[in-house]
């Protein structure tokens, strides 16, 4: 078993995805202070997702990515990030049948 570092805001989604055999290899919640204005999850293999969480794009069949729009201040970023993570978690619950 390979272990990956998981940002705290993504722990719920990553655990649920891996438990449901949607295996992940990399992820980032996005960090204002490091000028990383996106949240993403990379999967081991291409997934045939019918849809993505609200605001996310599917890249190359194996990456879900959200690029932040409100990055002018840390407060705006954190507010948008909270909404993004909530949308992601709702999508994960739907995908894994826990809705």
Q: Locations of the language-model features?
A:
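Short cationic amphipathic helices and targeting signals
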Residues: 34-46, 62-79
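Terminal, regulation- and interaction-focused segments at domain boundaries
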Residues: 1-6
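Short glycine-aromatic motifs
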Residues: 53-61
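Ampiphathic alpha-helical segments that act as solvent-exposed interaction surfaces
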Residues: 65-99
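Amphipathic, interaction-prone secondary-structure segments
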Residues: 7-54
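Short glycine-rich, low-complexity/disordered patches
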Residues: 22-34, 61-65, 93-99
């Amino acid at each position: 078993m390979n272990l990956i570092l998981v940002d705290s805001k993504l722990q719920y989604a990553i655990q649920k995805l891996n438990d449901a055999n949607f295996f992940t290899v990399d992820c980032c919640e996005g960090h204002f202070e490091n000028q990383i204005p996106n949240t993403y999850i990379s999967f081991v293999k291409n997934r045939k997702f019918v849809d993505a969480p609200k605001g996310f794009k599917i890249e190359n069949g194996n990456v879900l990515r959200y690029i932040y729009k409100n990055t002018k201040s840390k407060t705006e970023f954190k507010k948008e990030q909270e909404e993004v993570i909530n949308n992601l978690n709702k999508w994960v619950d739907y995908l894994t049948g826990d809705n």
